[in-house]
Amino acid sequence: MIGLIQRVKWAKVEVDNQTVGEISMGLLVLLGVEQGDDQAKADRLLEKVLNYRVFADEQGKMNLNVQQAGGSLLVVSQFTLAADTQKGLRPSFSRGATPALAQALYDYFHQQAALKIHTQTGRFAADMQVSLQNDGPVTFWLQV
């Protein structure tokens, strides 16, 4: 399971020109589900996302996690993160989970997140437009 996290000043996701999820300061989490992923991996990734220290403390050092900084999560499904780009000029998605598994784990991830922090989401498998102001920029690839 892959989480590409971006520290943002704000982020929103739209479907058919309608905003379906929006946060102010926090983390945009692009979530990719791979074959073999399960709820245990989702739990580990969520704990990493919630505890990853990417927000500045009083001394300007990245020492606070999203909860300590008072931020939120915007979780967006992103199957292209599971792409194999090693060969050729076209990505292969053979490592990606089936749509049913990916949706189940995406739903599980954001539901568990919502129990711990203010969480907004995109819409699984929809054609989405994601807008954000990356703060830093600060972007990390987390994989479990």
Curated annotation (Swiss-Prot):
SUPFAM superfamilies reported in the protein's UniProt record: DTD-like
Gene Ontology CC, one term: cytoplasm
Enzyme class (EC, first level): hydrolase
EC number from the UniProt entry: 3.1.1.96
Catalytic activity, as annotated: glycyl-tRNA(Ala) + H2O = tRNA(Ala) + glycine + H(+); a D-aminoacyl-tRNA + H2O = a tRNA + a D-alpha-amino acid + H(+)
Domain of life from the UniProt record: Bacteria
Matching InterPro entries: Daa-tRNA_deacyls_DTD, DTD-like_sf
UniProt keywords, alphabetically: Cytoplasm, Hydrolase, RNA-binding, tRNA-binding
GO BP field: D-amino acid catabolic process
Keyword Chaperone (UniProt): no
Motif range (Gly-cisPro motif, important for rejection of L-amino acids): 136-137
Endpoints of the signal sequence: none
Localization of this protein: Cytoplasm
Keyword S-adenosyl-L-methionine: no
Gene Ontology terms, MF aspect: D-tyrosyl-tRNA(Tyr) deacylase activity; Gly-tRNA(Ala) deacylase activity; Ser(Gly)-tRNA(Ala) hydrolase activity; tRNA binding
A family per Pfam: Tyr_Deacylase
Major site of localization recorded for this protein: cytoplasm
Role of this protein: An aminoacyl-tRNA editing enzyme that deacylates mischarged D-aminoacyl-tRNAs. Also deacylates mischarged glycyl-tRNA(Ala), protecting cells against glycine mischarging by AlaRS. Acts via tRNA-based rather than protein-based catalysis; rejects L-amino acids rather than detecting D-amino acids in the active site. By recycling D-aminoacyl-tRNA to D-amino acids and free tRNA molecules, this enzyme counteracts the toxicity associated with the formation of D-aminoacyl-tRNA entities in vivo and helps enforce protein L-homochirality.
Record-linked NCBIfam families: D-aminoacyl-tRNA deacylase
Family note: Belongs to the DTD family.
Subunit-structure text: Homodimer.
Domain-related comment: A Gly-cisPro motif from one monomer fits into the active site of the other monomer to allow specific chiral rejection of L-amino acids.
HAMAP family: Deacylase_Dtd (MF_00518)
UniProt xrefs under PANTHER family: D-AMINOACYL-TRNA DEACYLASE 1 (PTHR10472:SF5), D-TYROSYL-TRNA TYR DEACYLASE (PTHR10472)
Protein name, as recorded: D-aminoacyl-tRNA deacylase
Protein source organism: Glaesserella parasuis serovar 5 (strain SH0165) (Haemophilus parasuis)
Gene that produces this protein: dtd
